[in-house]
């Protein structure tokens, strides 16, 4: 009788230990690669926006984006994911005129996939946004800084 309860207790303990185990090195390496890809995509977008040949930059700067009050953890990636649709719309404005932003849809799609891998499918995190909005360049710079910070803790 007690043997079955003891075995159940041991099984539950093993499940708890396995679920709370630290990330394996292969998972860490994969996370590093995903963060690096997200960082590169953000930098590519920023370079396209800041390109001196971008005739729509002044128009793009009128659009405002929300940024989290304090982005320091992976859960904050949900905030970036929520703003990607707006980012895609703003970047789509000059698409035919700016060679550097022609692959916007593909970049945003790649970022969505990468974000899903990094943050998982859970969307229960509610972002606390800063009271002040940011321009497109401020928005991209803030997320680039966030990715660099997270990436440095992983390496």
UniProtKB/Swiss-Prot annotation:
GO terms for molecular function: cytokine activity; growth factor activity; interleukin-2 receptor binding. One of its GO terms (cellular component) is extracellular space. Residues 1-20 form the signal peptide. SUPFAM superfamilies: 4-helical cytokines. GO terms for biological process: activated T cell proliferation; adaptive immune response; cell surface receptor signaling pathway via STAT; extrinsic apoptotic signaling pathway in absence of ligand; interleukin-2-mediated signaling pathway; leukocyte activation involved in immune response; negative regulation of B cell apoptotic process; negative regulation of inflammatory response. It is found in: Secreted. Belongs to the IL-2 family. PANTHER family: INTERLEUKIN-2. This is Interleukin-2. The lineage of its organism: Eukaryota, Metazoa, Chordata, Craniata, Vertebrata.
